[in-house]
Structure formats: C-alpha cells, structure tokens
Regions:
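A conserved beta-strand/loop capping segment in the N-terminal third of enzymes
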Residues: 1-30
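Short small-residue beta-strand/loop micro-motif enriched in glycine and branched aliphatics
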Residues: 8-11, 139-141, 209-212
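FAD/FMN-dependent oxidoreductases across multiple families
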Residues: 17, 46, 149-231, 236-237, ...
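Predominantly flavin-linked oxidoreductase catalytic cores and closely associated redox partners
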Residues: 26, 30-173, 187, 192, ...
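C-terminal helical "tail/cap" subdomain of flavin- and related membrane-associated enzymes
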Residues: 233-333
Length: 333
C-alpha cells in the first residue's frame, strides 16, 4: 500500500489474480456441463408472483426481451450485477451508491508480484488506484473514484505522473477497437436491507456485496451464490418457497461476511483524513503489516497519537481497523 507521501507498507497475503473474462466463461461452461441452459440476448422486464388456489406462493412468471420469454420458474437467483434488476423491478430496496472504476491493461510492467494499492486522493477521490500484475509482464493499472465524471482523466493523469508513463496500453481481449480503457460502476453502500423475497435471492453485486474499502467482489459473489443455491435446493425439496423460509439465506451470509457497518465507518474516517494525516499514519505502521497482533496494533496507535493527538478526534482507530477487515480472509481486497 502506497500512501500520499510515497510511504509504502506491505500487507502480505498469498492469492490468485483472475483473468476475469476467462474465469466467468469457465463458470458458464461448467454450469452448462451440469445441465444449465445459457441464454444470451435476453433482458428481464417484469416479474409476477404466482399463487395456488390456497394463496400459497408457487413461483414466478417472468417476461422480457428474448425468445425464451415468458419463463415460469420456482426460484430466481438474481446475479445481474450492479444493475440489481430484480430489486429494481420489484422496488425491493432503494438504489445504493456506486463508485466508478476504470483501468488499462499494460505491457512490460515492472513488478515484484505484489499488488500495489495507491491511496492517493489527488487522483482517486474517496477511492484508490492499483497495479495488479498478471502473466507475461502484463498488469492492470486503474482506479476507483467517487468523482465519476473525471474517472478517465484522473487515471490518465496518474499514469502520466508515475513510472507507468511510457508503458504500452493494449485493449482487453474482448475489446477489438476503440479506447483501451475499460471499467464500470461498483456498489459501495454495503448489502441491501433485503436480499430475499418469496422464491427470490440476490447475490454478488446485485445484493451490494463488495469489499467496502477496496471494492473487490468475486469471492463474495461466489460464496453468496453457494448459499443461495443451497437454500433454493432445500426449499424446492420442502415445497415451501415463502419469504420466511428464504430468509435463511440472509442469515447465512450475515454470519459469514465481514462487519460491513464497521468497515464503512472506517472507510468514511479514512477519507476524512488529509493527505498529511494519511502519510503520518502510514509512517507509524511497521514495514510488514500482516503480522501485527494486538500489542503491535496498540503500539501503532500510541505512536500515532503521540505524533498527532488530533487524529484521535478524526476516528483514526476505525480507519486503521478497516484495513484489517479488508484482508482476503475477511473477503476483502
């Protein structure tokens, strides 16, 4: 992690970098091999609950654009991403906040196999920038920012001001022409209040499941999908798809996922700090942050408060804790 004054600290965890377009294609192929049907060029427009003569919920009637519509189904698992289609159609939740993300794939990027996270508000307002190494000297260089209109300009300015300046940018494999930049929007408000209804569960970004500080979401999506699949199978077998039974899904992910409220408060506190405050905080961290136990964290807090007592009033402790909760073992990054 690189802070505004250039102070760099390590938080070491082993992990994998996914070529996401290949990973998602593989998931789809695996599903089809197990009997799923993959229907492209379809857009859901409406969802209507179905009931039997006794008023018991029996499933959904879905309509929209595409040759397979209308579709009748017992359970819907909404994995529609940030669009959160089912939630929007049913007015199930208020729309959450989103942040803009954009990146380039670059060639011959110097790397030590660590992911570099730059917490530099000058370029990424209430966000951060990254360098994510991939195979064969390739890397993704990008940012997320709440200043959505300035996203691409800010990324270009960051690249121009750093050692990435003269590196070649190439379009991603699925983008044959046009500007090589690619990205989209990411939910940042935390989980929706309701992630279930009669015969319905929301997973991944469609449920607001992203890591609050660094906005990663693949492992949260995969785990929530596993929970949803288990609940769907059990409730179909039990012939009870009522919301009261589907609510078990929300209990499962609530017990598994990190304390979103704490992380969001810590994130807010972090971005309330000035660049100088952030840099002083970084200088008080050990060079390797992954091994800090309770005593190590206490020592950092004491060093911070001795150097700048005013940081206590700026909620520096929640800001520091947000880093710990953003590690991979807590579904972070």
């Amino acid at each position: 992690m690189i802070f505004p004054d250039g102070t760099a600290k390590k938080l070491t965890e082993e992990g994998y970098v996914l070529e996401k377009h290949l990973f998602e294609r593989w998931i789809a192929e695996e599903a089809v091999s197990e009997g799923a049907q993959l229907q492209l060029s379809h857009k859901l427009r409406s969802m209507e609950k179905q009931y039997d003569a006794n008023g018991k919920f029996t499933g959904w009637l879905c309509d929209g654009n595409g040759e397979q519509f209308p579709i009748q189904t017992k359970v819907i698992i909404d994995a529609s991403g940030v669009a959160a289609v089912a939630s929007k159609i049913l007015d199930l939740n208020t729309r959450g906040q989103v942040i803009a993300g954009m990146q380039y794939e670059m060639l011959e990027v110097p790397t030590d196999d660590y992911l570099d996270f730059y917490i530099w508000p000058e370029y990424a307002e209430k966000g951060y920038l990254w360098m994510i190494p991939k195979c064969d000297g390739r890397a993704n260089v990008g940012l997320v920012t709440e200043d959505k209109p300035r996203t691409k300009k800010a990324l270009d300015e960051f690249i121009e001001a750093t050692h990435f300046k003269d590196l070649e940018q190439v379009p991603p494999p699925w983008k044959e022409k046009g500007n090589p930049a690619f990205g989209g929007t990411i939910p940042i408000s935390g989980p929706f209040e309701l992630t279930y209804d009669d015969g319905l569960m929301l997973v991944g970004d469609a449920a607001g499941f992203t890591s609050p500080l660094f906005e990663g979401g693949s492992h949260l999506a995969l785990k929530s999908a596993t929970f949803a699949a288990d609940v769907a199978a059990e409730q179909i077998a039990a012939n009870d798809l009522s919301a009261s039974k589907m609510s078990r899904y929300q209990k499962l992910w609530s017990n598994e996922f990190p304390p979103y409220g704490k992380i969001l408060r810590g994130k807010s506190a972090l971005f309330d700090l000035t660049d100088e405050d952030m840099s002083i905080m970084a200088q008080c961290f050990p060079d390797e942050m992954s091994n800090m136990g309770p005593h190590g964290k206490l020592a950092v807090c004491l060093r911070l408060l001795m150097r700048r007592p005013s940081l206590y009033g700026k909620r520096i402790i929640p800001a520091m804790l947000s880093f710990g909760y953003s590690r991979a073992k807590f579904y972070g990054w």
